Amino acid sequence: MTKKMSMQDIILNLQEYWAEQGANLMQAYDNEVGAGTQSPYTFLRANGPEPWNAAYVQPSRRPADGRYGHNPNRLFQHHQFQVVMKPSPENIQELYLGSLTRLGLKASEHDIRFVEDNWENPSMGAAGIGWEVWLDGMEVTQFTYFQQVGSIEVDSVTAEITYGLERLASYIQDVLSVYDLEWGNGVMYGDIFKEPEYEHSVYSFDQSDEKMLLENFDQYEAEAKRLTKLGLVHPAYDYILKLSHIFNLLDARGAVSVTERAGYMHRIRSMARAIAREFITARAKLGFPLLKDSKLREKYIGEKGIYTKKLAKKIKKEA
């Protein structure tokens, strides 16, 4: 057992720190996602004017990055620690540096750089200005201010901080391979994840059923559209996440051409936009219950509020 902070310790310290800063500790979302951003705790909640602070670990699946467990740093599944704060605090960068200090990484003792790297997720219609955070030459975090989510301009800027837990732990424990990381209590990362990594790589590159996946894509898209029309936001969003994962599996398998790839991404993006709009509408109908500021409530749902007008138009259109 190493005396250095285990991956489990890193997670516990980050959870404790961000809870102290007002974040709600959520659990990993129980669906296939390619990044913490795709969790509804980020993607959906970044829409609309309501404040929202959350932190959670999110296992993230990226089929094309699998390497059968042979590469020390490229993985089918890695873990992100996701923090979202909306509206973004003015001192968010200082808060982030404070989280590194909690992990024993003081800014005065390390070369910590914010390297401009504006971020975009084309298939989900999400984008923002941002930075990669480099710790002594290694990228450990992506820092983003959302400008658009679901192809919709945001009402309130969300700050997103995404820690790459394997990278951060590799630096802290000073190991070259993620499989040599201590997860916790003397149990190694490789003991838990190396076999699944190999098996998922075999499936993604060699054994996935292309015909079935293509059929599933069409079926899940149709179901997402049906559920969206019914106003069932969260079940519909689950199917959009499944669409995204199936597309990633098809892409890893080499089953889609460059032209087809753009078409599939457009279909996912269209659904993401539709569900983002439906989520905002649903929250507006509820009166944006998390929005407590009286001036902001007047701005968005007062007699002449932005969403009061939008809801009136929607009701008139549906009548």
From Swiss-Prot:
Q: Which superkingdom?
A: Bacteria
Q: Its Enzyme Commission number?
A: 6.1.1.14
Q: Which SUPFAM superfamilies match?
A: Class II aaRS and biotin synthetases
Entry annotated with the keyword Nucleotide-binding: yes
Q: GO molecular function: any one?
A: glycine-tRNA ligase activity
GO BP annotations, alphabetical order:
glycyl-tRNA aminoacylation
The entry's cellular-component GO terms read: cytosol
Recorded catalytic activity of this chain's protein = tRNA(Gly) + glycine + ATP = glycyl-tRNA(Gly) + AMP + diphosphate
For this UniProt entry, which segments traverse the membrane? Answer: none
State if Zinc is listed as a keyword: no
Q: Which UniProt keywords apply?
A: Aminoacyl-tRNA synthetase, ATP-binding, Cytoplasm, Ligase, Nucleotide-binding, Protein biosynthesis
Locations listed in the record = Cytoplasm
Q: How does it assemble?
A: Tetramer of two alpha and two beta subunits.
Q: Which family does it belong to?
A: Belongs to the class-II aminoacyl-tRNA synthetase family.
Protein name in the entry: Glycine--tRNA ligase alpha subunit
Species in which this protein is naturally found: Oenococcus oeni (strain ATCC BAA-331 / PSU-1)
Q: Which gene codes for it? A: glyQ
